[in-house]
């Protein structure tokens, strides 16, 4: 989101719906950038930890249990018991939770078959596509072209190089598709604040994956040391810690700065895979990753500028109507 979105779009959603921002001293811009980078490192490192757990547990078990623990942790942080359930629009929550579950389980399946940076790059096509769909500008063709070029470069053309797993690619693209659905579903009014929407959505996603968790072989092994600690660490690194850091960072970051910086996540994912998992990328794949990052940054900047221009034009139009003279 990118790993489980993760946290980036959830946090923007929560912020847009009136999240209860903690009463903390506003950080400087440099501190805010540092906190956001630390949050992204936490998210992508959680993907690395998940790949380690795949050696001991089925992918579906890791995915389902991680989502369950994350839901519990965020419920405690956001005090889910304060929700007025009479106001909840369950149709929006259900679509949001289904998108979360699909995105989570398909991405974990993807990183089980692909290098972390490659999987994140393919998944990133989902939100990039949504952004480009809603941004009708002349610059859009540049970002679409860069994204397509990046996808092409992801494939190893060297015959001696190890080919990418086609099933893994499909999983990553599927995760990206669910990520796109997740973004659209997150814009639907749920009747409650953004933080509570995230909590209920995660519990819905957990319920969807619960049968998988119950039927998982070797489930009792999860409760043995040190695996229980690993799963808690996975949930904290993927949700609780980045949420907290990004909440503080957003106090002194514009949406443009936030969106541009989070476009670096594919690169951070690749670096995490290289450091912790010794995952090597071809130079063409590294170039592809940077190309997709550039497309995302460019899309973020031009979309934000276009939005600001529209808002300015609307204000001028309203002012002219109010003062016909």
Range-by-range predicted roles:
Residues 74, 98, 125, 139-158, ...:
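Hydrophobic transmembrane alpha-helices of multi-pass small-molecule transport proteins
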Residues 1-61, 95-98, 102-106, 149, ...:
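Glycine-/small-residue-enriched transmembrane alpha-helix faces in small-molecule transporters
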Residues 58-59, 115, 193-194, 254-255, ...:
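A helix-boundary/kink motif common to multi-pass secondary transporters
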Residues 61-64, 68, 108-138, 175, ...:
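Specific alpha-helical transmembrane segments that line the substrate/conduction pathway
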Residues 30-35, 61-76, 140-146, 167-171, ...:
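Hydrophobic alpha-helical transmembrane segments of multi-pass integral membrane proteins
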Residues 38, 65, 96, 122, ...:
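Hydrophobic core positions of alpha-helical segments in small-molecule transporters
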Residues 22-25, 67, 227, 263-325:
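C-terminal-most transmembrane helix of multi-pass membrane proteins
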Residues 37-45, 49, 77, 94-109, ...:
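Hydrophobic alpha-helical transmembrane segments of multi-pass membrane transport proteins
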């Amino acid at each position: 989101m990118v790993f489980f979105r993760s946290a980036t779009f959830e946090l923007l959603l929560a912020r847009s719906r009136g999240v209860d921002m903690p009463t903390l001293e506003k950080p400087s811009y440099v501190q805010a950038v540092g906190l956001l980078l630390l949050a992204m490192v936490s998210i992508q490192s959680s993907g690395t930890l998940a790949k380690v757990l795949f050696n001991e547990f089925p992918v579906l078990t890791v995915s389902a249990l991680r989502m369950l623990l994350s839901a519990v942790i965020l419920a405690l942080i956001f005090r889910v018991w304060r929700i007025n359930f009479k106001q909840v629009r369950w149709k929006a929550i259900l679509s949001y939770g289904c998108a979360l579950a699909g995105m989570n389980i398909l991405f974990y399946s993807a990183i089980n078959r692909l290098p972390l940076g490659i999987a994140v790059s393919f998944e990133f096509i989902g939100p990039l596509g949504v952004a480009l769909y809603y941004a009708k500008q002349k610059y859009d063709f540049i970002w679409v072209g860069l994204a397509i070029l990046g996808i092409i470069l992801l494939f190893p053309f060297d015959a001696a190089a190890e080919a990418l797993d086609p099933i893994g690619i499909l999983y990553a693209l599927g995760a990206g598709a669910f990520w796109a659905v997740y973004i659209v579903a997150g814009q639907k009014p749920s009747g409650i604040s953004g933080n509570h929407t995230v909590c209920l959505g995660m519990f819905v996603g957990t319920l969807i994956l619960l049968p998988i968790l119950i039927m998982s072989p070797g489930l009792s092994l999860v409760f043995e040391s040190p695996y229980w600690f690993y799963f808690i660490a996975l949930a904290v690194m993927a949700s609780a810690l980045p949420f907290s850091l990004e909440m503080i960072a957003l106090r002194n970051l514009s949406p443009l700065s936030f969106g541009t910086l989070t476009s670096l996540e594919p690169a951070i994912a690749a670096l995490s895979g290289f450091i912790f998992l010794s995952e090597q990328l071809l130079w063409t794949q590294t170039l592809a990753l940077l190309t997709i990052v550039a497309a995302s940054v460019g899309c973020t900047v031009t979309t934000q500028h276009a939005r600001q221009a529209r808002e300015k034009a609307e204000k001028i139009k309203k002012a002219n109507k109010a003062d016909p003279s």
